[in-house]
Amino acid sequence: DEPLPGAVEFVKALRSRGATVMYLTGRDIPRMLKGTAESLRSRGFPVDVDGVDLVMKPVAALDDALFKRDVLREALKTHSRVWLFENEPVNLNLVARDLPQIGLVYIVSTHSGREECADTLSRIEHFEVDAESF
């Protein structure tokens, strides 16, 4: 997967302001950890540094949406604000229903087509912003 325009700079800007960054993916550790970490690293994303976590499913059989919801529920215990930037409506809809205190941003991109996102969610197609503005 190629990163959306501005994504690397956006993540680096968040880190420079002290935010914890979590790459939360439905990929599984046994088959995909090495390749996922290398893919992020090779594209310029911070990986293996303080304040950055790559969180993947321990086994492939876990449902992506439930896994992500449960990880985010745990994140709420240690972080005052949690945001999910996500391209899959199934995941966003579940989190919106079960964890309404999480900020949600729909990344308009290819997805499963199983559900549509709520019209009320913020939507983006890229991360190109003036880094000084956030």
Predicted regions and their residues:
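Catalytic-core regions built around general acid/base machinery
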Residues: 6-18
